[in-house]
Each structure stands twice: as structure tokens, then as C-alpha cells.
Amino acid sequence: MTRPIDVTIVGGGMITFDLLLPSIYHLQRTGVIGRIDICALDSPPLKALKEGFGQAFPGQDFTAHPSETEEPQKKYPDLYKEVLAAMPKRQAVVVAMPDPLHYEVVMEALRNDQHVLCVKPMVLQYAQAVEIEKLAYDKGLFIGIEYHKRFDRRALIARRHYELGDFGEFVMGEAKMIEPYYYRASNFQNWFTCDKTDPFVYVGCHYVDLVQFITGLRPVQVSVVGVKGKFPNGNEGFMWANGRVIYENGAILSVTDGLGYPDEGAGSNEQCLMMFCEGEGKTGLIAHDDQFRGVEHSYLRGIGCAGSTFNYVNPDFYRLVPWEGPGYQPVGYGFDSVAAILNTIQRIEHAAAGLPEAESLARRRAIIKEVDEKAIIATP
């Protein structure tokens, strides 16, 4: 019998609420996940997570660090280290912190012999990615980077046709992802500063990765310019950015990103991809409108993004829907991405269970190489 793996999520913010915890709760239902722990800087987000899923996941719970009853003003920046140190070896750590903190949390997980699911981008420096890749492979630990756009059916279809030569060779493209304006009033204002990151790094990486995923072409050169602005707390950040990416065959991708899609818009963001390809005597085209997917809802109350009432609804990324079991189940390529990484970790541990350490390490490394070569899940 395949044993479930325990999961510790480090970070209790937006992505944990919107995707990670409900996905992991459902995987707990199906026997992939056992114990769930969540670490956060303070108690308020943990309290919100405790209260947010009773209808969808009746009877399911997690252990909060610190306790959700702790005084909200108390901060625990290093508590996650104690929690990771107490975990049984070779379970799963989900890294869902602000981008500049990914490196130290991933490294702490590896030092404690844990497999890792990390939200994108994994780290902000190439040298850090190389360091993580080496340490993880030396220990036979899997690192999966949660680039969920890879699991969008339209991306998988495009990849297959590109592999078959149906488009020709990618030469020129443009992409766009403008996130909602209300992000500026969120915790972003505390970490999304000019010295730390910008919209291209934060969300533009989705499309840089997606073009590589579809074509197999690796980026070799990147240049970025940005427009600065002030957050409500006075911190300065890049609110807008445009990046130009050169791929190994000379192809060019322009990527425009920002924190500025109108809160009153149907959005909830603006995102799209267009790729032109050269063939023999003709050209090919891949065009994805990733914002409008054919569904419009107008609510009686402001339950949409930023309190909006009229929304373009994305049924493909992540939604909680009725199913034959209790509560609701998550569906969509966001859930598929999380499930693929955690299922892979469970598969690795099942294959290595009961083997002597040297054989176990060799078996884990073999599966890690297999997943790398398949290149569906993003890895270092």
C-alpha cells in the first residue's frame, strides 16, 4: 500500500488560500497527503485559512504554526525552521513565501531532507538555482516548481503540435499579464519593492517559461525596463515592466506586466500569448486569449475580484465544484499542477520504500532524472 506523505506549507498568504491548501486538502481525501501543517509569520492568515474551507472540506483541518489563537501582533519569522526540523525525513515542504524569501526556505527544507514544491519563480538568481539543483540531486530530493500554466490544456495541445512540427519554428512573440490594482494595497507593498523584484520577475516568468515549455527553446538573454510608483505605505516599487527575452535560436519574446488591471474591470486580470513561427514557404501561429474563456457572471453582490459584480470567469485554472463526495472538489490546471508535483513526491518515496540507503538514493535519483527528461513539471 502506498503511504501518504506529510506536507508543511511555509506561507499563509494569497496563493495558499486561493490554490494550495484546497488542492492539498483534496489530495488528503484521496490518500496522497497525510498530516498538514502550515507556518506563517503571524496568526491572522492562519485564522482565515482555518475558517475558509469548512463548507468545501468538512471535517478536514491543519496544524497552525503559530496557533491561530495567538495574539495577531506577534511575529514568528523563524518558526518555520523549528517545524521543518521536526518533520519526518523525505516528506514535502510547500514554499509559498514572497519571492525574495524562496531561496532560504528551499535550502532549509533541503537541509532537513525534505522534497519541495515551490511556487514560481523558484529563486531570483541563476547561481541559487544551480546550488539548489545540486544539493537536491545529491540527496535524492525532488524539487517541483509550480508553473501551473504548463498544465493548461491549451499549452499542452500547443506543445504537442509544436513537437510534431505543425507550426514551424518560433521566431517572434508577445505576452501580457497585468495583475489587479488591489494588489498594491495588499502585503505586496511590504516586499514588492524596487530592490527586490518587479512585475516581469513575478508574473512575466510564467510566459517566459511557457514559451520554453511549448518549444523546448531556452532563453539566453533577458533585458527589462520598468515604471516605478508608490504603494499606499510609501514604499517604492515597479508597478509596470516590459521584458525582452532572446531564445537560443534567436527568437524574440516581448512580455508586458504590471500591477494595474482596474479593480472595476471584468478581468480579473489581463493575460495573453501570441507566437509567430516560420515554416517552409509559410508561417504558423499560436494565439491564446488567457483572460476571456467564454464565461461571464454578473453577481447580485460584490463577490468578484476586488468586490466586483461582473466578471469574466476562468473555469480552467481553479474552481471548487460539486462532486460525488463530501463538500466540493478543486478542478482545473492549477490543481493539476499541485497534484502532479505531490503525486511525484509520493511516487518517489513509494518506489524507494524499504530499500537500503544506497539503493534508495539511486532509485530516487533515477525517477528525478525521468521527470526532468519528461519536462512536464518544471524543475531546477
Walk through the language-model features, giving the residues of each.
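Contiguous beta-strand/loop segments that form the cofactor/metal-binding neighborhood of enzyme cores
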Residues: 202-307, 312, 317, 323-363, ...
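Predominantly a Rossmann-like dinucleotide-binding segment in NAD(P)-dependent oxidoreductases
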Residues: 149-236, 242, 361
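Redox-cofactor binding/interface segments in oxidoreductases and associated redox assembly factors
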Residues: 94-95, 118, 175
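Short helix/strand-capping hinge loops at secondary-structure junctions
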Residues: 113, 119-121
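N-terminal glycine-/serine-/threonine-rich beta1-alpha1-beta2 phosphate-ribose binding loop
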Residues: 1-112, 130, 134-138
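Rossmann-fold dehydrogenase core element
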Residues: 131-149, 169-173
